[in-house]
Structures are given as structure tokens and as C-alpha cells.
Amino acid sequence: MADDPIAPTPESGPGGATRRRFLQGAGAAAGALMFGGIGGAGRAFAEPASGRGVPTGFRGDMSDLKHVVILMQENRSLDHYFGTLPGVRGFSDKQALRFPDGTSVFQQKDASGAIVTPQVDDGTWGNDHGAWGDVGHRTWDQWVQHNGTSCMNYHSDAYMGFYHSVAAQYTIADQYFCAEFGPTDPNRKYLWSGTANTETGNSDESNYDRPWITVAEQLQNAGIGWRLYSDNSGNGRDGYVSSWIGDYGDNELKYFTGFDPAGLSAGDPKLRPGTGLIWRGNCTYYAGTTAPDDDSDANLDAVLRDFHDACQPGAQYPLPQVSWLVAPYGWSEHPSADSLHGERYVKKVLDILQSNPDIWNHTLFILNYDENDGKFDHVLPPWPEAGTAGEYAGSYPLGLGPRVPMLLVSPWTRGGYVASEVFDHTSTITFLETWAAHLGKPFTCPNISAWRRSISGNLTSALDFGHPRPGPASFPDPLAEQPVSITADHMKVRPLAFHPHATLSEDRRSGKVTASMTLAGGSTGKALSFQVFPDDYQPFTSTPLTVTARTPREYTWDTTATDGKYAFSIYANDGFVRSFAGQLPQAKPADRGIPRAEVELLACEGVRVTLHNDGTRPARYTLTANDYLGGTRQVVVERGQSRTVGWPTQQGYYDLVLTVDADASWTQRYAGRIATVR
């Protein structure tokens, strides 16, 4: 029996519920933004039954996965599509970047200094989407100045009703980034090959001149079945002959030497139906055009005919283990193509998969987007340090680029989850590597940089192979344009086995303040990108630092150059923030309380705060929850003494601000998430 769908409800204003406010059951503003509450009062999904055993026909491990189907659509940011979805780190993110003037990243300034904030607009505008320098990658504050006010627009809950329903029934990744801060072609090369080899611009389709190996070729060599499904209308290398047929030049395999059909005879093994490399890659054109050439359901049937046929029992060429889909322009969501057509295309794909339960119940469908189209997204992407091998084109870091949507539909992602490990386009490749190794057919993509492998996860933290939930699902009609009812506590977070931390130490003799950044837990070589921003006294710019469990990093502020004062913040993904401000005591009278704090993160437990007083008078600390649990507490520490306080978390998340009455300049903030599995 199918689960009840998320029910359509009347539109409830511009925003609906947002981000992690489901943890406290209330909507909150980011910066000056305010959004509405939960939209509508229709039925919502029930929680999955606890203690459910492994269903018949499943082993409860990765061997249950038989098919991976990957669809990369075009040019949308995560905030643009999902900034209002409950449980997703969107417009009410209280851990978002703040600027020195007190405004937040949601309050972008135009050339005149006027503030522009996100606004609902269901149009199909496009924005410029060039390389890193375009939005101020070291400050994240030039979106409007480069891309215009429309880059701040986002789609309404009603317009996104279908996609919001898919996310609420399955899993959305809210720390998924495009591979490069650039346009379509480089990002698609990362999906199919693990690199763009420092390319930062689009190029002509089907020139077949990239010499490096693709993942498709590696699958072929490993004996893993694969195929790319697209409409191949056209006579030559034009990419597409209309909006509704062809591949829009998005079949990136046509850019690689291994798929060049030139000079091959009709009997060449590369062209052999069913097994040939070029046949599987759909890298030759046929004369004529697909009919009908319009946006009808009949056209959808036509452009997806090969995929449909592969999913039928007894198919001549059955669905292989790995499939890629490439949509014609009009269905691709690339502005000015609209999102509703893309939602119709995706629903058709899901309907085709569901038509064969043997396939549906053993398939992972991955929907992602190649790039953000210049559309605003507020979350800082991980950033490589200068000189990082394979991650710079001249002086510009290649990636990661802004967040883009990723939805994961499968029996192992069902139930309404948010996965918050850092992923990018190469994560799909490393997932395929992991699966192939499990199948006994290992391969390793040689093109993914070591830095990227350490930063971006392999998607496995988003899936629960031990508790599959097979069976059909119901999805709303995209053309209904109805918002869906998602209760504030519906979305759940996927657990992580690692957490970042940063602590502060003051050397009062030298005048230096040092932040020490660490990473605890995770797989061997796991890394996280920290970015340090001065909040005052120094120019506002980012210092990136890559941290692993074996390579902690430090950031030092010399207060002798700033009159003994310091103020800076450290940001990392999934809501990690540290903010430290104060003035070293030698610049002030000594007859007072002198604050010092030590904060420990206890995996699967909580936060432990030890408050010290290095001065000569009592110090009264105030501990305030800026988000999540904790409320407000006051703790008095006598001179030369210390006191320890336990601080709670919600699903591992915490956000705590420390102040002290003895020193108005002193404040510390600790926000993030502790590991919730060992």
C-alpha cells in the first residue's frame, strides 16, 4: 500500500516554514527577513514505523541496490527552489554569514548601497553565471552588484509543490554544491569525469577533444552495465533543433575523445547495440526529428521512449546498473525554460520507474543541478587554500561553487530526511566507486583531486541500507501548483559520525589570540573547509583553512596591531560558527574579573562549557541559546575559580552565546552540530 502523499493545501504567503525551525516548531528570521509559518493544514506524512525489519527480498546492505539513475538538470540554486522548505538550511538560517555592519548574507547591497532581500517570483528569468570573482568569493556580498536584483528571487511553495513533495517523502541534501563556480559545461564534466581540467567556460558541443577518461568508460572497463538516455534528434552537432527535442548539448560524453564516432564502420564494436561504448553513450545523431515537437505528454513519451522501454519486463535492452538521463532544453529547467516543465519531466521519470516494482524497489534516483545560474544561495561553499593541487585556474579557486538542489529517491532515502554532509558533483562518482567495490568490480576515478575527495562525501551518509522502505509513492501533479502540507517536525536529519570544533586561546604577554580548529571522527582523510572572517578592526575577507583529524589548523590574530582588540568569526558547513571578540587584559585595569572559557563537544552527548575567572573580582557569565535548546542561564565564577556547565543539543545541533558582566567587549559564540553516531 502506498504512503499518503503530502497533501496540497492553499498557498500561505510568501515563505512558508523554513530551515531547522522544525526543531523548535517555530519560524525564525535570518537577518531582517521574516517568513510565515507552516503552510496549510492538510495531511502530512506519518513517521516511519520503528523497529521495522528488513523486507522480504532485501538483505539490508548495499547489495540490495541494483540500479542508479542520475538526472542532472540545469541552473538553479538551492535557496531558489528549497529556501522555504521546513528542515532545510534556507532563509531562516540563524547560523548564516554576517557582515561587519551587522547585516546578514540575506541582505545584499546593490551598487547604491540599498539592501535587497529574497523575494518570491515565479518567473523564468536568467542571471549571469560566470567564474568565482563575480560575486566576491572571499566576501559573498556582491550577488546583486554582479547579477542584478532578480538573482535574489525564489520560487513560491505552490510553484515548487511537486519538488517539495518529493523532498518531504524522500531525502534532500542541503549541503550539496556544484563542482565549480562556473557555467554548465565544466560542471557537467565533473559529473561524468571528476574534473573539468581547469576549464571555466562553456564550449561547443560534440567536439570530442577532451582526452581524459570518463566514468562511463571506467564502468565499461569494470564490467558494470551503463547507458545514457537522451533524445538524439538532429543532423550534425547542433545540440538541439528546438526546445522540446534533442539533448541541448548536455550529453557531456560527446566532448570526450573516447566517444568520437568519426571514421568508425557500422560494425565497429563501439557502435554495437546493447554493449558498444558509443551506443551506450548515445553519442551519434540520427537524421530527422522526434515527433511531436512540443511540450505535450506525447512529446515526453517520445523523448523518454528508450528509457521507458528499458524499464519494461522483458526489455530488449533492460535498464543497466548505471543510467544517466539528459533532457531537451524545454524540459531541462534552464531559464528561460521554466521549472514546471522540469517537474513534469521528473514526474514522468519517476512514474516510469514505478511502473516496474522490481526496478523501483531496487533503484536510487539522483536528481541534481549542474550550476546555480547566478541565482543567490546564502551558504558559503568550501574553498581550497591557494596552491591546492587540481583546484585552481591561475589565481582563481575552481570550487566548490554555490549550493544546488539534490534529491535522492529510493527505498533507502524514504521518510523525509535532510542530509547535511558536504557533497558535490563528484560525490556521485565516489558513490559509484563505493558501490562497485561492494559488487566486486572496483574502479577509482583518477581525475578527482585529493582535496575534493577529502571535502566531499560519497553520499552514503544520506542512505540507510539497513532499513529499506520499498513500495509505491504518490506525487502531486506539478501543473496543480499547490503547496504541500509539511509539519514543522516532519523532516529529520541524517546522522553524521564527525564534528568540527574551534576553540580560542589568549597569550596575554605576546598579545596574540589563536583559534585552534579540529575535526573529530569521520572516515580516514575526512576534511572540512573552515573560513575565517574578521568582524572588526581588519578588512573583511576570508581566510580558508582545510582541517582533518590529523591536521588541525590555527588562525592567529595579533592584537598589538589593533589596540589589544580582536573580533572574528569562523564558518564551516552545516551551521558551524565560532565568533570570538574581546580585548586582552593588559590594555585594561587588572582589578576585575577576567573571563576565559573552554568548550568541549561530546559525541552523542552534548556540549560541556567550563567557565574560568582569571581576574581579581567575581565574573557573572550569561549563557544564551541563539538557536535550539538551552534557554538563558547565569553563572557566577569567583576569582581564580571555574565552573562547568552542561549544554543540551537538538538532534546534535547547538548555538550558544557567552557574555560576561566584567568585560562588555568579551563575547564568544559556539554553533554547530556534534556527531550523533560513533
Regions found by a protein language model. Name each.
Residues 2-678:
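N-terminal pro-sequences and low-complexity stem/linker regions of secreted or lumenal proteins
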